[in-house]
Amino acid sequence: MQLSLQNRRYMMGVVMCLIFMPPGMWVTSLPNILETHDASWLLPYATALPPFGMLVSALIFGALSDRKMHAERLLGILGISGAFFLWFGFSSLKWGWHPGWYLVFQGVNAVISGPIFALITKVKLTNLPNASKSFPIYSMFGTIGWMLGGLLTSQLGLDWSADAGLLAAYIRFIMGALCFLLPATPPTDFESRGWRARLGLNAFGLLKIRELRVFYIASMLFAIPCVAFFMIVPIMLVTFGSEHPTAQMTIGQMLEIFAMLSLSLLGSRFRVRWFIVVGLILGILRFGLFALAGELGMLSVIWVGIALHGPVYTYLYVTGRMFLDKRVPDTMRGQAQALFQLLIGSVAGILGAFSCGWLYQGTVSGGAEDWTLFWLALAVFSVVPLVYFLVGVVGKPAAAKI
């Protein structure tokens, strides 16, 4: 199929929607799905699996897209192959196999899926004209996809069913096939040699740049407590009487659309760093609202906290990718995004899964039911990356592109 360049750019919006729709269906449903299959004990390990997989593959595939292979083709191969293991993972639960098999299949899927977000980011930022305006708009299609996935799951009554994961796998397969219709994004680094280049380890050289180092570390620290959002909030919703937790978790995506539009309209008028600061502040406020909901016992306050997830994600992580792209050379684009995904998704994901799980066991589970203490502890921790970023980046002059 031959498509014009403009139509291939439009295809980026379709692919973004289909990338985020599958996790929107099963990620927020997973705590309840595992409970249905008497496997709630698996939740911390299942939450930590994607970060572990990303730890293995993100930098390697990021370097591969910079050095050897078209990013859109690599994205298609990973999308299709990952769909099979996603399907087997949830099928193993339906078939009544030991829950450990779910970890095995999802572990392979995690390795395959780890580079996907970094690769689609590279494709968009490489091919979009006026990225400061158009990048948030195309990212908004991912928001719509996640929201549609959650709403469809609840509409079909799959909030507690492994069928949510099977349907997600079918959509993931279609996404992978459509990736081959994306704009061509060829490799740009033809000079790097050696095993460090092959493994993507040259990306760690970016940490020598003060501004990038502070941004990477602050983002990673903030992402640690954020793991509790998808890991614990669905449980909190059910505890407080929600009958459709997966659909209600999409409230954040509704506000995220407006945040994306505001970023597109205002991104060229204000420095990117200030959007990141706003995202960090709203993240702390979000945890504060969850703590207040625990004190008042009000489901509506939880909904307000969920709504803030949209601006938090947009102003910190979408803007953060733009922040990086402006500060690295073309030959490091894929690896810079892969390192970002590695730190916020892998390192922070692993630390967050176990630390938030431990904190939950000590404050909420086992009859304690102290939701307020749980969320206040996360709010206090989130102040650390905010202060670090304010001192290390906002308080310093902007660095030039290296």
Question: Where are the regions that the model predicts?
Answer:
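Helix-loop boundary and gating motifs at the non-cytosolic
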Residues: 2-52, 211-250, 317
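Helix-to-loop junctions at the C-terminal end of transmembrane segments
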Residues: 56-70, 157, 259-272, 360
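Hydrophobic core of transmembrane alpha-helices in multi-pass small-molecule transporters
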Residues: 17, 98-118, 123, 220, ...
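A membrane-interface helix-boundary motif in multi-pass transporters
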Residues: 155-172, 358-382
